[in-house]
């Protein structure tokens, strides 16, 4: 419709009509104060255009439509949803998305339908308000400023893409340093020797069945005796092989290690046209390959690790440099999980790249990997933290926080772990990481850590200022983290953090002890008169997770309190009684049932983490001494970087 057709008509003094060739005044311009002049038409048009821009601009910030429909319109029952087959997801992982020790994203569906409805409505309001603010800010800019911002952003992205695609001219030669503490003598105590041998036999059972029924595939289905693949890895194969390499090495399963190495050399291929989880591929594949190189010195592992690292660089092609969660390995196009706070990146995912990327720069001689993860630090340090806490969601386009949901479990967990370990791995020179860690821990203690009526210490979740008194299995890693960082704590606080680690270990042991299977649920609650018990059906499963064993390992190494070996052996017996089947080890759908209901997946992290931590608990401390080795979020081993190899200089304020 022509603009003139939208404007009002005014009667002229002569009785004609102005505003179009109507009546006797056709073709004559109106005159006098009643006539609508050209400048007024332009102003009205501009106002109308601004209104349309605000309305349509908001659409792009609404949540994913499928999430909205399922959460708001259909009120789907979480109890009817199957347990996830794999590790998250922060972590999360909607089959493949909702898990994450981001270290893994939060698994399972939200709680009751009414809460889900309220969460979705709050999210819509928040996204709508953000869209209006951003549209108003854009309208206030001059056209020249908008054009300049667009050109600068395009130039930055183009420069990053060009730089990342520049071919590596071969890897520089490096002097392989023989690893410290990778061979240990047998424990002197016969009972401990027997228990350690049992755990090695468990590894053989898991490995041999994977080899027999799923060789070259990602994971094993031990009941149906076939392969299991998760979309987390796209078309990349061999997750269990790469994840198990360092466990095979330290258990001195030399023949199996050589088999795995040959498969990597001949079959591990990253030239695939598929979308992968940057976080999961980094901690499992990059971490596993780096660890295998540092233990064995085999060049193929260094080559493959750097090759994969280069493939992951396009994930950082965002305006802020905060990487995408998902990346197409062929096209280099990234995106985020559609359910993650309006397309935000997840703290536990982009915060769990630092250790591996610093080592990639160390082994390749190319600083680009270190620069990418140090930029993440720069972005985070510019942001205001609500109550000193780090929300789980960060928008990679705006560089601003998404929903103010804070968790030390799924979606947040390994970010905090990597701050502490970045300082330790730098030979205690990365003072910025140390400060960020202890500042975060202080805020966590103030706002999240609580004690139940019976004296159990737990870590709640923070949602916009309100606490949810729930603790996930993923959160149980924090006991070991607090204890590991105790020596570096501010003056007079070392014993406090060691005791805090012990209290978290006790709480997580209680979550195991209060089930029929003596294995812990995915999440447990402290409300409605219950303590350390899962009350929702979608939180009662156990998928061979390692976090409790991880905390037991650190607590044993740092205190030598025999109860940690006792608790670890209880877990071994429970795994043998309830998870072991003829075809390997399977997760359980409900740890409170009298009879097993299997999920039919042998997770790759069971070999990489759970069995490794158990083996170390029943080994002497000279096997992988903590002063020389750091464990990544998948329990892969990374040595302390020597001081003369620092990629980034950090000065204490």
UniProtKB/Swiss-Prot annotation:
| Cysteines joined through disulfide linkages | 476-508
- GO biological process terms on file: carbohydrate metabolic process; ERAD pathway; Golgi apparatus mannose trimming; mannose trimming involved in glycoprotein ERAD pathway; protein glycosylation; protein targeting to ER
User: Where does the protein end up?
Assistant: Golgi apparatus membrane
Indicate the principal place this protein occupies in or around the cell: Golgi
Q: Which reaction does it catalyse?
A: N(4)-(alpha-D-Man-(1->2)-alpha-D-Man-(1->2)-alpha-D-Man-(1->3)-[alpha-D-Man-(1->2)-alpha-D-Man-(1->3)-[alpha-D-Man-(1->2)-alpha-D-Man-(1->6)]-alpha-D-Man-(1->6)]-beta-D-Man-(1->4)-beta-D-GlcNAc-(1->4)-beta-D-GlcNAc)-L-asparaginyl-[protein] (N-glucan mannose isomer 9A1,2,3B1,2,3) + 4 H2O = N(4)-(alpha-D-Man-(1->3)-[alpha-D-Man-(1->3)-[alpha-D-Man-(1->6)]-alpha-D-Man-(1->6)]-beta-D-Man-(1->4)-beta-D-GlcNAc-(1->4)-beta-D-GlcNAc)-L-asparaginyl-[protein] (N-glucan mannose isomer 5A1,2) + 4 beta-D-mannose; N(4)-(alpha-D-Man-(1->2)-alpha-D-Man-(1->2)-alpha-D-Man-(1->3)-[alpha-D-Man-(1->3)-[alpha-D-Man-(1->2)-alpha-D-Man-(1->6)]-alpha-D-Man-(1->6)]-beta-D-Man-(1->4)-beta-D-GlcNAc-(1->4)-beta-D-GlcNAc)-L-asparaginyl-[protein] (N-glucan mannose isomer 8A1,2,3B1,3) + 3 H2O = N(4)-(alpha-D-Man-(1->3)-[alpha-D-Man-(1->3)-[alpha-D-Man-(1->6)]-alpha-D-Man-(1->6)]-beta-D-Man-(1->4)-beta-D-GlcNAc-(1->4)-beta-D-GlcNAc)-L-asparaginyl-[protein] (N-glucan mannose isomer 5A1,2) + 3 beta-D-mannose
Q: Which residues lie on this side of the membrane: Lumenal?
A: 63-653
The region called Disordered is annotated at 81-116
Gene Ontology CC: one annotated term: cytoplasmic vesicle
EC number(s) per UniProt?
3.2.1.113
Example GO molecular function term? calcium ion binding
Its biological purpose: Involved in the maturation of Asn-linked oligosaccharides. Progressively trim alpha-1,2-linked mannose residues from Man(9)GlcNAc(2) to produce Man(5)GlcNAc(2).
Q: What is this protein called?
A: Mannosyl-oligosaccharide 1,2-alpha-mannosidase IA
Its lineage opens with: Eukaryota, Metazoa, Chordata, Craniata, Vertebrata
Gene name as annotated: MAN1A1
């Amino acid at each position: 419709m022509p603009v003139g057709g939208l404007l009002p008509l005014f009667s002229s003094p002569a009785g004609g009509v102005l505003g179009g060739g109507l009546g006797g005044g056709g073709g004559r311009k109106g005159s006098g104060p009643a006539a609508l002049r050209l400048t007024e038409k332009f102003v009205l048009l501009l106002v109308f255009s601004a209104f349309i821009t605000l309305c349509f601009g908001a659409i792009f910030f609404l949540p994913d439509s499928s999430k909205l429909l399922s959460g708001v319109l259909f009120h789907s029952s979480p109890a009817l949803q199957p347990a996830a087959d794999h590790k998250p997801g922060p972590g999360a992982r909607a089959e493949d998305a909702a898990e994450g020790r981001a270290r893994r994203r939060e698994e399972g569906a939200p709680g009751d339908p009414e809460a889900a409805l309220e969460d979705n409505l709050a999210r819509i309001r928040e996204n709508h308000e953000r869209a209006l603010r951003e549209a108003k800010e854009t309208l206030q800019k001059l056209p020249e400023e908008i054009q300049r911002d667009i050109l600068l952003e395009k130039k930055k992205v183009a420069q990053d893409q060009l730089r990342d695609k520049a071919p590596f001219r071969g890897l520089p030669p490096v002097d392989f340093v023989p690893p410290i503490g990778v061979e240990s003598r047998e424990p002197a105590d016969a009972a401990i020797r027997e228990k350690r041998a049992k755990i090695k036999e468990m590894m053989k059972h898991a490995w041999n069945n994977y080899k027999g029924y799923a060789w070259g595939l990602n994971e094993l289905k031990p009941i149906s005796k076939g392969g299991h693949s998760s979309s987390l890895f796209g078309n990349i194969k061999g997750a269990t092989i790469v994840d198990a390499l360092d466990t095979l090495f330290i258990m001195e399963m030399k023949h199996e290690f050589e088999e795995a190495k040959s498969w990597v050399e001949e079959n591990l291929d990253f030239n695939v046209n598929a979308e992968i989880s940057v976080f999961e591929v980094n901690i499992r594949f990059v971490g596993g390959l780096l660890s295998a190189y540092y233990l064995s010195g085999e060049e193929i592992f260094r080559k493959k690790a750097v090759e994969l690292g280069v493939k992951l660089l396009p994930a950082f092609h965002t305006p802020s440099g905060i990487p995408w969660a998902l990346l197409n390995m062929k096209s280099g196009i990234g995106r985020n999980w559609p359910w993650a706070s309006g397309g935000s990146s997840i703290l536990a995912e982009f915060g769990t790249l630092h250790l591996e990327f610093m080592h990639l720069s160390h082994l390749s001689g190319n600083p680009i990997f270190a620069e990418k993860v140090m930029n993440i630090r720069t972005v985070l340090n510019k942001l205001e933290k609500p109550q000193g806490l780090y929300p789980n969601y960060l928008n990679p386009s705006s560089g601003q926080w998404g929903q103010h949901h804070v968790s030390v479990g799924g979606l947040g967990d390994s970010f905090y772990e990597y701050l502490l370990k970045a300082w330790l791995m730098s030979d205690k020179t990365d003072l910025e990481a140390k400060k960020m860690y202890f500042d975060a821990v202080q805020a966590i203690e103030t706002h999240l850590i609580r004690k139940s009526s019976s004296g159990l210490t737990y870590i709640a979740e923070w949602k916009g200022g309100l606490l949810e008194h729930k603790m996930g299995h993923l959160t149980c890693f924090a006991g070991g983290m607090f204890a590991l960082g105790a020596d570096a704590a501010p003056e007079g606080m070392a014993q406090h953090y060691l005791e805090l680690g012990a209290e978290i270990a006790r709480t997580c042991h209680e979550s195991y002890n209060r089930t029929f299977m003596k294995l812990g649920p995915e999440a447990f609650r402290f409300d409605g008169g219950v303590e350390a018990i899962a009350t929702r059906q979608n939180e009662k499963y156990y998928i061979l997770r390692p976090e409790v064993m991880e905390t037991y390992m650190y607590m044993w190494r740092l205190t030598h309190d025999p109860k940690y070996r006792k608790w670890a052996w209880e877990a071994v017996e429970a795994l043998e009684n309830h998870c072991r089947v003829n075809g390997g080890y399977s997760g359980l759908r409900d740890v409170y049932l009298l009879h097993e209901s299997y999920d039919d997946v042998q997770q790759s992290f069971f070999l990489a983490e759970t069995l490794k931590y158990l083996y170390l608990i029943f080994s002497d401390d000279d096997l992988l001494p903590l002063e020389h080795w750091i464990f990544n979020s998948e329990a892969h081993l990374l040595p302390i970087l020597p001081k003369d190899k620092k990629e980034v200089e950090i000065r204490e304020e």
